[in-house]
């Protein structure tokens, strides 16, 4: 039972007994460093509620100090864990007895799943969508942030006690795919990933670029012949051929379908390698080629319910002006679906495929904010009860400092290249620091990748998802400050202590706590609440910054007290136990961020 769970009913009882008042919510916060106390109750919200003859002789409202003192005295007299209190400007700072922290620590010190909640069979599952790439080019820096956010949010929600499914929708059809296919036919000379030595997604991306170059040449030639740029873009032979290929695909022409399947498989194989290196995975896959017709049958249901309306030209719309939005088309006049229709149908299909799904999280950039507001509102108006449990995990752009890691085309940073660069940067810094003499070459390679990818993931995930960010590769691999390697180094330092502790650390110890020990236990105690808060807010940044605070507290503890050199055996054992729990917490929290920790550095 957490400290808040102990204090909450006691304070409610105190208020009921003192003022004959029943309240629903008590507001707590951490006690500020400059004040004496372990947890603080905010008094202000109660002041306007309490006005009774028992409060003051004339029945006037209490001032903050009077109210705080009355509640504080009640807690000292009636709650064993409360040792003392003080009131500062409307805040009741509560001092908790040493025994509470000792007992709490002894209860959780060997709990490998501390902070994690097992899912209930009765709770609905959450489906988290992320990645969702096009199959005409490799994954890039934007996909990296998307994948890291989606994967981490899924893991955090799972740790909070929900069953989770990870999914993506792959945009495997359309004119952009046909551009790569046509360019390969024209310029590829039957090149394959095997003959070229390129990953499949990079090979297909190469021909997407080749198409664009050829297209620009044809546009320029037509403009020299007197065409306007707009006319040239429409009349260039290569774009007309690509459009015909799309029509052939839609008609199911065997040769086009065979090439489409072959080149898409090259891309999927390439993506699989990138996902494996990035450390993300999926439980299910949806393909636009299978889903683009979904939702059309829902349009008729919407018309029958009066949710949708048909225009004279036969197109179908929904009028959301009363909801502060616009009219939105859901079916074109020629009967073809739009993206919104497809997304409606895909959401419904997912609930059919996974009957226990009761909510979904869509990890998509903030340029799609309006799209998801409309999508969720349409699904609600169609009467789906799970529509109220849909969430758009909107995130900002991620950029690199100018001149850093530009791709050959000078526009997009390739995800594979970024991971390789991070590993190389980690290698250079590690070699400069030394201490690698005892490592085999294989161990070094694993260490460099662990540090490099840990730096990349932590630097991205520590930022509030809603904010745009600048990713600085060199800064992210720094071994000091709010970085992944700094936290990994602290974990490795603790593992070194544990290897040197050649004595039994499983015994139960009761000792007077040093202030630094108490602060560490208080920080550890916050972990379950942080997980719940991060899940509710879909924010890995809350986990990342919690771990940074824990590591800062541990390093202060490490600098202040003696651990293995402590002469008092009980204190020595307790400090090693405490160190181990900090390491365990770092490790489990980093799993929520998809980050590995090295046993030594």
Swiss-Prot record:
GO terms for cellular component: cytoplasm. It catalyses: tRNA(Arg) + L-arginine + ATP = L-arginyl-tRNA(Arg) + AMP + diphosphate. SMART domains: Arg_tRNA_synt_N (SM01016), DALR_1 (SM00836). Gene3D superfamilies: Arginyl tRNA synthetase N-terminal domain, HUPs, Isoleucyl-tRNA Synthetase, Domain 1. Pfam families: DALR_1 (PF05746), tRNA-synt_1d (PF00750). GO terms for biological process: arginyl-tRNA aminoacylation. It is an enzyme of class 6 (ligase). Keywords: Aminoacyl-tRNA synthetase, ATP-binding, Cytoplasm, Ligase, Nucleotide-binding, Protein biosynthesis. GO terms for molecular function: arginine-tRNA ligase activity; ATP binding. A motif ('HIGH' region) lies at residues 133-143. Its EC number is 6.1.1.19. It is found in: Cytoplasm. PANTHER family: ARGININE--TRNA LIGASE, CYTOPLASMIC, ARGINYL-TRNA SYNTHETASE. Belongs to the class-I aminoacyl-tRNA synthetase family. Monomer. This is Arginine--tRNA ligase. It comes from Flavobacterium psychrophilum (strain ATCC 49511 / DSM 21280 / CIP 103535 / JIP02/86).
């Amino acid at each position: 039972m957490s400290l808040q769970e102990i204090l909450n009913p006691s304070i409610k009882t105190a208020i009921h007994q003192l003022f004959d008042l029943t309240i629903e919510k008590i507001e707590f916060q951490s006690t500020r460093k400059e004040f004496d106390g372990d947890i603080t109750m905010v008094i202000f919200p109660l002041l306007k509620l309490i006005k009774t003859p028992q409060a003051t002789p004339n029945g006037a409202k209490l001032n903050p100090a009077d109210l705080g003192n009355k509640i504080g005295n009640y807690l000292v007299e009636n709650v064993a864990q409360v040792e003392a209190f003080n009131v500062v400007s409307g805040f009741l700072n509560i001092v908790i007895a040493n025994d509470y922290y000792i007992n709490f620590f002894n209860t959780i010190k060997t709990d490998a799943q501390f902070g994690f909640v097992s899912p209930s069979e009765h709770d609905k599952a959450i489906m988290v969508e992320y990645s969702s790439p096009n199959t005409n080019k490799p994954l890039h820096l934007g996909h990296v942030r998307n994948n890291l956010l989606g994967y981490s949010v899924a893991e955090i929600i799972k740790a909070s006690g929900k069953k989770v499914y990870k999914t993506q929708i792959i945009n495997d059809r359309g004119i952009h795919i046909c551009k790569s296919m046509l360019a390969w036919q024209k310029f590829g000379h039957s090149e394959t990933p095997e003959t070229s030595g390129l990953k499949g997604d990079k090979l297909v991306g190469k021909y997407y670029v080749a198409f664009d170059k050829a297209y620009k040449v044809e546009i320029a030639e037509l403009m020299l012949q007197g065409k306007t740029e707009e006319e040239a873009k429409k009349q260039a032979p290569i774009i007309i051929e690509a459009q015909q290929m799309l029509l052939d695909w839609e008609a199911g022409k065997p040769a086009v379908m065979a090439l489409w399947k072959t080149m898409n498989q090259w891309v999927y194989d390439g993506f699989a390698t990138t996902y494996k290196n990035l450390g993300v995975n999926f439980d299910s896959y949806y393909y636009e080629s299978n889903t683009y017709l979904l939702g059309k049958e829902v349009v008729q249901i919407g018309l029958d319910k009066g949710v949708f309306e048909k225009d004279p030209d036969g197109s179908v719309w929904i009028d959301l002006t009363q909801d502060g939005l616009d009219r939105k088309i859901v079916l074109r006049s020629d009967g073809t679906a739009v993206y919104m229709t497809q997304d409606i149908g895909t959401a419904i299909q997912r609930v059919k495929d996974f009957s226990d799904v009761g909510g979904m999280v869509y990890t998509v950039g903030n340029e799609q904010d309006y799209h998801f507001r409309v999508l969720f509102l349409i699904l609600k108006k169609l009467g789906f009860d799970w529509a109220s449990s849909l969430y758009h995990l909107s995130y900002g752009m991620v950029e690199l400092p100018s001149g850093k890691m530009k791709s050959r085309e000078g526009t997009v940073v390739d995800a594979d290249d970024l991971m390789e660069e991070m590993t190389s940067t980690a290698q250079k810094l590690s070699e400069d620091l030394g201490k690698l003499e005892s490592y085999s070459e294989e161990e070094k390679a694993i260490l460099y990748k662990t540090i490099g990818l840990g730096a990349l993931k932590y630097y991205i995930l520590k930022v509030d998802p809603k904010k745009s960010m600048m990713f600085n590769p060199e800064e992210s691999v720094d071994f000091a400050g709010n970085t992944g390697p700094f936290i990994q180094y602290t974990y490795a330092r603790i593992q070194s202590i544990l290897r040197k502790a050649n004595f039994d650390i499983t015994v139960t110890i009761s000792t007077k706590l040093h202030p630094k020990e108490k602060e560490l236990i208080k920080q550890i105690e916050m972990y379950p609440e942080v997980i719940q808060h991060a899940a509710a807010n879909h924010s890995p940044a809350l986990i990342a910054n919690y771990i940074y605070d824990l590591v800062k507290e541990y390093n202060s503890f490490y600098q202040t007290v003696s651990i293995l050199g402590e002469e008092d055996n009980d204190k020595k054992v307790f400090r090693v136990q405490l160190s181990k729990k900090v390491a365990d917490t770092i490790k489990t929290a980093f799993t929520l961020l998809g980050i590995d920790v090295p046993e030594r550095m």
